[in-house]
């Protein structure tokens, strides 16, 4: 358990106490404890300061290892938690099996850029491990951030440096593995979407070997885009051999010029314009390309999007977008701005073919595509019926204050 390290002598406030730790990410200088996988002895040193003079005292503290329950097929919940939203966990969030702490980035020298994850966030996020929840570090490479990812994966030598730095970070901070969010290989080679598939395969293979050599319990996962195009940048059959799980990003599946669901479970075959792509379509593609169902994790979006349709018919669904633009909005905002005005200018719709909810705001002429308790229930049933690994959430901090969506996930994953 955590303990308090006092800053002043209890009987003499003129005596100051300063603390250092031989392993600050096992026991912090403030007494936060983050256990590892093995018993660890940490030396705490107290500096007693009075009248400009210092005296030092040291004591060894033994930290017992943490243990985790085995991840159960069709019962595993992964929750991404972005650093910019993290404050502390709710009771429901701690019922996730794995937290993907987001994000670290790749520096030009292939070290990890942890600037978004200060000590306050790290200690707070890693506290979940004491509740039996694994905490994995997610490394992002999106847009321009792809370049350093690309360079790091390019050669055997660059990969060795990159992987060594990753493993060092996992062991230093007591993470339980790594999640790769490289979006996307081939970003800087337009027209050659699969140009870095081999480098990606080599990276995941060598990283997996390095992690498992340190601890067979370490996880290696990857977020890979859903839909009909993004997967073409990856050799799915090969890379899936070296990944414990693949997080299928089954959201943002709308097309900007049309009024679509962004995270529908099924496509509407009879009305093909009702959705650009779906969870089922994406899962089918990944299985066809050689990914075992037991490694596929489908995404649940704790956010939605809105656009202005040209026509209000059927709430705008299936028509054209007036400005070919969607605006992203958290579920918390959807609940406050739109759902609070049901029957007061906002109409709720359920698309039973696509198993997706949507709203039409007649006051502002908005079509809103989002996730709710009913669509979460449908997705979890689909996941179980198809023998998939579980579900993942992007992103825990976008839920309502009352935890509407995480409660639905937990209830349906029991």
Regions picked out by a protein language model, each given a short descriptive name:
Residues 55-68:
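C-terminal edge beta-strand
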Residues 108-120, 164, 185-336:
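Substrate-binding surface in catalytic domains of secreted glycosidases
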Residues 66-170, 406-408:
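Glycan-recognition patch characteristic of GH18 chitinases/ENGases
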Residues 139, 300-382, 409-414:
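Glycan-binding loop/region signatures in secreted carbohydrate-active enzymes
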Residues 40-52:
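Append "Rare intracellular matches occur via the same short Y/T/C beta-strand/loop motifs
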Residues 27-39, 43:
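Extracellular/luminal low-complexity segments enriched in Ser/Thr/Pro
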Residues 99, 137, 180, 207, ...:
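Conserved, mostly hydrophobic/aromatic
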Residues 1-18:
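Solvent-exposed, low-complexity, repeat-rich "mucin-like" stalks and linkers
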